[in-house]
Structures are given as C-alpha cells and as structure tokens.
C-alpha cells in the first residue's frame, strides 16, 4: 500500500475530515488532499506531526515492512 493510501485510511479511521488534518498541518484542505492523492510529496515535518497525532511510526505511514531495514546485515 502506498503512503498516501495509508494517510487517507488513518484519517477516515479516526473520523477526521481533510480540513481538520490540514489545519493540524497548517496547510489548506486542497493542498492536503493532494497528499492523499499522491500528487504532492509529504514533507518530513508533516510526517512527524502525523505520526505523533495518530500515534503510529513513520515506517507504518510509509508502508515499510516490520523488521530489519532493507540491505542491512546484522554485522554492521
């Protein structure tokens, strides 16, 4: 699943409108909707704000698998 789909699911699961989340991020509803459509990249500072708000990890929002990061061995 893409991060923008996860953003939308989190918002809906928490019964929030795009306007409410946009206000949290100090942006407009129109601009926030473009995050959910994948038309604008999500800035890191917004990612951090959303992680704290929804109480999830950045890995979760970014759709990364649990466990060790790609390409890293245990011996590093």
Segments predicted by a language model, with ranges:
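Short, charged recognition helix plus adjacent turn
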Residues: 62-76
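Short basic helix-loop element that most often maps to the first helix and adjoining turn
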Residues: 5-24, 49, 74
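Hydrophobic side chains within well-formed alpha-helices
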Residues: 3, 7, 57-58
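DNA major-groove recognition helix of helix-turn-helix/homeodomain DNA-binding modules
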Residues: 26, 45-60
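Alpha-helical DNA-recognition elements
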Residues: 34, 38, 49, 67
